[in-house]
Amino acid sequence: MTIYMFHGYTSSANDHWFPWLAEKVEAELNIPFKKLDFPDSDHPVESVWDQYCETHINPKDGITLVGHSLGCIQVLHYLDQHDIHNVNVLLVFGFDESIWTLPELNSFTDHPVDYSNVLPKILKVTVISAINDDSVPYPYTLTLARHLHAKFVLMPSGHHFTDAGKDKQLPIAFEELRQILR
């Protein structure tokens, strides 16, 4: 079993809370954690990110996919495009529709996710948001959670979890991931 981390817009594999989560998962859960580092995240192109996934993810049943922000819709695209099953999913500040705050990302949501194809592939899924996120307002993430029939965790604060505090940790992500993997 391997966990793959999908970062978001203007981000990289070594930003925010991603390195902390990778270290924590590998140390405490003894599961390989691969942080994907998508090209040109300041000007993302869906087809380029799709190709990156093709060359960096081993599409095996039972993998776990973790996404943040734009990485969440990329997780769904990946699931839609591959014949894999029993996939665990953790999405943090995800969306599956155009967002007024980030119109530059509309190309990733121009074609709707085929949930009739995606849902049967998912074993467990949790979606996390914060009530005060200005980048991806939580109603977008709640809609995504409803489409996925997911457990939804709404934090009272945290904005977009891009700083995750001075220590760059996001304990709720680890706790929810641990529960998903039980």
Which residues does each predicted region cover?
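Catalytic histidine neighborhood in serine/cysteine hydrolases
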Residues: 32, 146-162
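Flexible "cap/lid" loop of the alpha/beta hydrolase fold
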Residues: 42-50, 94-118, 165
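Catalytic histidine-centered segment of alpha/beta-hydrolase-like enzymes
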Residues: 44, 158-170
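Gly/Ala-rich beta-loop-alpha elbow adjacent to hydrolase catalytic centers
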Residues: 66-76
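A conserved short beta-strand
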Residues: 84-97
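Conserved alpha/beta-hydrolase "acid-adjacent" motif
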Residues: 134-140
